[in-house]
């Protein structure tokens, strides 16, 4: 399946949501990246960037201030590949902490026991990224398939929590999370 990325809007977080464009924002494979698993990152200067991609490739694009369109880069391209590691599979996420950009992603087989989250650090959101290692792996006593995450920061503190999905050991369907 090709996949696709759309934009939905609502006046309230709980919805209801409606399709903002009437068509996908991205509906094609570019640089080998399947259009899935988008993550929007707002940098300190107010610029919004979207990271997305499956099938072992990750793209980055600039978004308009209203988040409804893609703004071409200075070279005229809409997408730049920023795949951080040969082990990248899907689920990109970025945060900025102490002036450094932390890029995280899922790797391994998403239906198997080796699905996990790895991370890299860079001085800019564009890279180059230096892989540091894995930040989340399965606990064979608890569950498998730990991956595809987000991170939240406790307001006013240098404290973060990772939120992810996994499968209990009793679950045998690799597509169940």
Question: What do the PLM-derived regions correspond to, one by one?
Answer:
Residues 1-177:
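Carbohydrate-active catalytic/glycan-binding domains of CAZyme proteins
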